[in-house]
């Protein structure tokens, strides 16, 4: 048994666990991070698209712009609480954001391609509104105003529903194209930077440590693993599987089939095609050197994955005939879905008992907002905004590679 008593034990070494561990360490808390796998960020954070969402994609969602506001709030918090990280190269301006040099984010803006349905007035109106919202976000004054609380239905004028419909009719393409504020990211650089700061503040990490039991006793928590027992004042569970196991909370699993392709043309953009028929929505995120991730939407049923993957590949080859599929994989997405929801695109922070908390993250991009909000819920104040040095180098191999990168490395 470990004789140390930590302020916090964090169960789960994905982006949720890493950002929460860092924000706690930033304030001088003693933190132990437990991960069942050999490497950190080796499940959901490994397979995702590396897509930094501005919220624009959810301007089409019928949720009163709730998801959009959550994602804009994440960018607010990114600027406020992560701006002193060396790799944080997204910069606020008086009119949108810019990517400065190399670092966490790439100067690779994702093009939205709305499929034209000229005889579907509802879709045409939704597209018109979405385009207007993108314009508002692209022109937002990040230097003077926060965005998360600035965009709701009151910002959408009646004219926004129809003033872009003539442009859709005038377009000769099957799609109406609009460059969005969404960008691609370098997730391993980002995770490594955040982890290095936490390690510099004495974060302890134990990998290959499967949690067998979590016991709340005498105003503290005992976490029993396959190799040891650890004591802490509090614990937060950031692993969906562990949340389901120990807290009896149902977690929904869905499936995201992705093809890793090469020979992507240099003049092709990262893009997403949008259609009211969701299964026709495909996307391509460029990775450099002619490599790309070709994907679509997330499937609810595993049995539908193979046929849908074939559809995705065929559609991408139709647009870029020269691409070659290197390999494919299926990313698992595990979400806490509330009653009446099909998907969870936000995050949930729950206090399950006096000393045990749980967190489920809907989008990687929301981690920058989720971690500071977790700190606020616990300590009823804002976390420190400035990180301290020295930082500690992250041991090679501690963080897993992304699935797409592993596929490319193994193919060469």
Across the structure, where does each feature detected by a protein language model lie?
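Dinucleotide-binding Rossmann-like beta1-alpha1 core, especially the glycine-rich loop
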Residues: 50-163
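Helix-loop-beta segment of a Rossmann-like dinucleotide-binding subdomain
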Residues: 94-116, 153-201, 297, 353-361
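Active-site substrate-recognition segment that forms the wall
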Residues: 19-23, 50-52, 88, 103, ...
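N-terminal Rossmann-like FAD-binding beta1-loop-alpha1 element of flavoenzymes
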Residues: 6-33
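Glycine-rich FAD pyrophosphate-binding loop
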Residues: 26-47
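C-terminal catalytic lobe of FAD-dependent flavoproteins
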Residues: 323-412
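Helical element adjacent to the flavin cofactor pocket in flavoenzyme catalytic cores
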Residues: 173-226, 230, 234, 238-239, ...
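Conserved Rossmann-like nucleotide-cofactor binding loop
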Residues: 16, 39, 242
């Amino acid at each position: 048994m470990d004789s140390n008593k930590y302020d916090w034990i964090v169960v789960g070494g994905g982006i949720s666990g890493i950002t929460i561990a860092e924000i706690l360490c930033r304030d001088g808390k003693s933190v132990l991070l437990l991960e069942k796998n050999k490497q950190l960020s080796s499940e959901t954070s490994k397979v995702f698209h590396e897509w930094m969402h501005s919220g624009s994609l959810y301007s089409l969602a019928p949720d009163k712009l709730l998801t959009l506001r959550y994602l804009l709030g994440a960018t607010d918090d990114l600027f406020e609480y992560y701006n002193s990280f060396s790799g944080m190269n997204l910069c606020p301006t008086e009119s949108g954001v810019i990517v400065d040099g190399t670092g966490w984010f790439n100067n690779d803006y994702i093009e939205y391609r709305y499929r034209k349905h000229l005889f579907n007035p509802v879709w045409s109106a939704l597209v018109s509104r979405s385009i207007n919202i993108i314009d508002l976000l692209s022109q937002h004054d990040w230097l003077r105003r926060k965005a998360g609380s600035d965009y709701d239905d009151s910002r959408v004028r009646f004219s926004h529903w129809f003033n872009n419909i003539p442009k859709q009719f005038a377009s000769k393409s099957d799609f109406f194209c609009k460059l969005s504020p969404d960008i691609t990211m370098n997730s391993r650089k980002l995770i490594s930077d955040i982890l290095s700061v936490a390690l510099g503040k004495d974060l302890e990490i134990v990998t290959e440590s499967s949690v067998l039991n979590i016991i709340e006793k005498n105003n503290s928590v005992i976490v029993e693993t396959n190799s040891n027992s650890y004591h802490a004042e509090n614990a937060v569970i950031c692993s969906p599987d562990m949340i389901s196991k120990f807290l009896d909370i149902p977690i929904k699993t869905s499936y995201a089939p992705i093809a890793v392709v090469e020979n992507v043309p240099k003049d092709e953009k990262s893009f997403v095609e949008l259609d009211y028929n969701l299964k026709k929505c495909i996307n391509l995120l460029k990775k450099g050197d002619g490599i790309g991730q070709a994907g679509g939407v997330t499937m609810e049923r595993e049995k539908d994955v193979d046929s849908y993957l074939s559809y995705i590949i065929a559609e991408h080859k139709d647009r870029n005939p020269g691409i070659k599929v290197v390999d494919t994989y299926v990313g698992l997405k595990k979400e806490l879905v509330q009653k009446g929801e099909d998907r969870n695109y936000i995050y949930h922070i729950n206090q399950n008992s006096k000393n045990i908390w749980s967190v489920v993250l809907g989008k990687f991009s929301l981690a920058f907002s989720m971690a500071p909000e977790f700190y606020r819920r616990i300590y009823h104040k804002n976390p420190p905004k400035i990180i301290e040095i020295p930082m500690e180098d992250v041991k090679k191999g501690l963080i897993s590679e992304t699935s797409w990168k592993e596929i490319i490395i193994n193919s060469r």
